[in-house]
């Protein structure tokens, strides 16, 4: 077994298949539908009756969906569907967010509660809060369609829904990226990737949705996506992923270990069984790595905080990425794809209901344990590599095969660089923009009315290495520092950010310069070799 550094694994992943050069709008991927041989491995599932607009009102599906130039459900169709459900069900409340997309589109969402609780009045009972989102990438239509199918099924199966809502309140944001859906492209209207903006918070839309998420404060969060269907491997490029579904829990090691184990040992295991029971296939979410030999290297979902599932998980909740096989095949197998997403979402809900006390208590204890922890924080990690097989499909003859691979596992990753957990951070008033970003992430900072004089831990920059590529407006940097203790005087107005907060792990990944997605890495706090980093730590 060998180790593979996470810092070399940063990848846009299975959903990154995009046009080589971006324009304003309509950045659509080429369509390569499955051959008849491959399609035979993904037949319709008997007895499927999905209760979402693409299936209950097929006449509303645009013709361009079959050509891979549009999704199946326009905004107005989705909005009417949500409003109709809310009018017919007292446990369902329709809302429009008080912010708009980059091009001025609305964000409808539904709040589901059996006790009339809401964002403003969440109630005082012992209940789980579950956040479900889809449509982060606009060219992954089974993501938001599976959310609509879930809502439709809950409206149809009132008895099941009543049992669910005894244990939890649910917020469903079906369409995170309405501009991307309009253009049928992965990106926001500004061509930023919405699923890589969770720490740097470059776009206002990201900040607005993040604040809604923080206000809801979920115990469980799920992010619905699709992955590229036709990615081929092997010497003859005749081997493709066989899975209908790929999924991953949040992997960042700054998430409480008890919460991570709950995700892996309870939720992930149950999800795999539920997918198989539905007649579907699954594997862990992976991306392709650069192998040093002829063997295919697949990398399990990484630990980077800029990605949605890890950013959500760093609020100390159970968080899952759920992906279905769909990018690049337009409307092909859409019922099976949507069913795959629905099965995963229902599995998470049902697992939480069936194991309510264990889930609720483990998460609440994990939050308390993390908040008051004095353990070290993890800044870099690595993945052990081992040989295993992965479910593949031979595209020539349609046979399912167990394909030998090298697998870089993050369940769990192995810490490399750790650092003592600070009691607090001191942030000079001149860096108010940094404080505002941290507040969006759900953190609170106190503005000191007096000057601070005393011992601090300062970080002196010993190395800055820039990436070779331009990424979303910046050239990212890998920063190394040396920690030194010294006396410091900081003026009144300096911010004190205590780390005795539930969301403190988001401060760690943002403020510690060595972390791959830190504010220093993204140039929000620019540094050079020899500089003193302008954020200070208290022991």
Swiss-Prot record:
Residues 71-352 form the Peptidase M14 domain. It holds the Pfam family Peptidase_M14. PROSITE patterns: PEPTIDASE_M14. Zn(2+) binds at residues 137, 140, 225. It is found in: Secreted. Glycans are attached at residues 46, 116, 394, 460. Residues 49-59 have a biased composition (Polar residues). GO terms for molecular function: metallocarboxypeptidase activity; zinc ion binding. Transmembrane segments: none annotated. The keyword Secreted applies. Residues 49-72 are annotated as: Disordered. Keywords: Carboxypeptidase, Glycoprotein, Hydrolase, Protease, Secreted, Signal, Virulence. Residues 1-21 form the signal peptide. Its cofactor is Zn(2+). GO terms for cellular component: extracellular region. GO terms for biological process: proteolysis. Its EC number is 3.4.17.-. InterPro entries: Peptidase_M14. The keyword Transport does not apply. The active site is at 323 (proton donor/acceptor). Belongs to the peptidase M14 family. Extracellular metalloprotease that contributes to pathogenicity. This is Carboxypeptidase 2. The gene is MCPB.
């Amino acid at each position: 077994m060998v180790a593979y550094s996470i810092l070399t694994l940063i990848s846009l992943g299975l959903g990154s298949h995009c046009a080589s050069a971006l324009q304003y709008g309509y950045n659509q991927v080429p369509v390569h539908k499955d051959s008849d041989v491959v399609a035979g491995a993904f037949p319709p599932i008997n007895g499927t009756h999905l209760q979402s607009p693409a299936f209950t009102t097929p006449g509303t599906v645009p013709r361009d969906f079959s050509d891979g130039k549009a999704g199946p459900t326009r905004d107005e169709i989705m909005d009417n569907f949500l409003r109709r459900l809310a009018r017919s069900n007292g446990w369902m409340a329709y809302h429009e967010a008080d912010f708009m997309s980059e091009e001025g589109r609305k964000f409808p969402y539904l709040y589901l509660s059996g006790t009339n609780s809401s964002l403003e009045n969440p109630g005082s009972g012992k209940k789980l809060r579950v956040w479900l989102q889809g449509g982060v990438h606009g060219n992954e239509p089974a993501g938001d369609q599976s959310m609509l199918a879930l809502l439709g099924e809950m409206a149809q199966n009132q008895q099941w829904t009543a049992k669910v809502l005894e244990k939890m309140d649910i917020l469903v944001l079906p369409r995170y990226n309405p501009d991307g859906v309009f253009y049928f492209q992965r990106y926001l209207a500004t061509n930023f990737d919405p699923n890589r903006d969770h720490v740097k918070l470059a776009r206002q839309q990201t900040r607005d949705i993040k604040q809604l998420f923080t206000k809801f404060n979920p115990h469980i969060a799920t992010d619905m996506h699709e992955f590229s269907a036709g990615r081929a491997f092997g010497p003859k490029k005749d081997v493709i992923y066989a899975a209908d579904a790929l999924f991953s829990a949040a992997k960042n090691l700054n998430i409480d270990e008890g919460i991570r184990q709950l995700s892996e040992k309870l939720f992930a295991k149950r999800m795999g069984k539920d997918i198989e029971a539905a007649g579907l296939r699954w594997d862990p979410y992976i991306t392709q790595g650069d192998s040093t030999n002829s063997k295919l290297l697949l990398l399990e979902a990484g630990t980077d905080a800029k990605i949605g599932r890890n950013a959500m998980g760093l609020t100390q909740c159970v968080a899952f990425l759920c992906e279905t096989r769909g990018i690049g095949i337009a409307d092909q197998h859409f019922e099976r794809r949507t069913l795959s997403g629905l099965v995963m979402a229902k599995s998470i809900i049902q697992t939480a209901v069936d194991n309510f006390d264990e889930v609720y208590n483990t998460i609440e204890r994990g939050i308390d344990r993390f908040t008051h922890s004095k353990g070290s924080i993890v800044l870099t990690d690595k993945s052990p590599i081992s040989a295993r097989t992965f479910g593949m499909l031979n595209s020539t003859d349609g046979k399912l095969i167990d394909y030998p691979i090298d697998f870089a596992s993050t369940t769990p990753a192995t810490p490399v660089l750790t650092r003592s957990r600070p009691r607090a951070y001191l942030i000079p008033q001149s860096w108010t923009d940094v404080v505002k970003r941290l507040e969006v992430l759900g953190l609170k900072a106190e503005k000191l009315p007096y000057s601070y004089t005393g011992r601090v831990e300062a970080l002196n920059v010993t190395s800055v290495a820039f990436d070779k590529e331009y990424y979303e407006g910046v050239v990212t940097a890998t920063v190394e520092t040396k920690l030194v203790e010294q006396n410091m005087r900081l003026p009144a107005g300096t911010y004190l950010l205590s780390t005795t907060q539930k969301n403190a792990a988001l401060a760690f990944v943002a403020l510690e310069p060595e972390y791959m997605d830190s504010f220093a890495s993204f140039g929000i706090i620019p540094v050079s070799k020899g500089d003193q980093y302008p954020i200070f730590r208290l022991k």
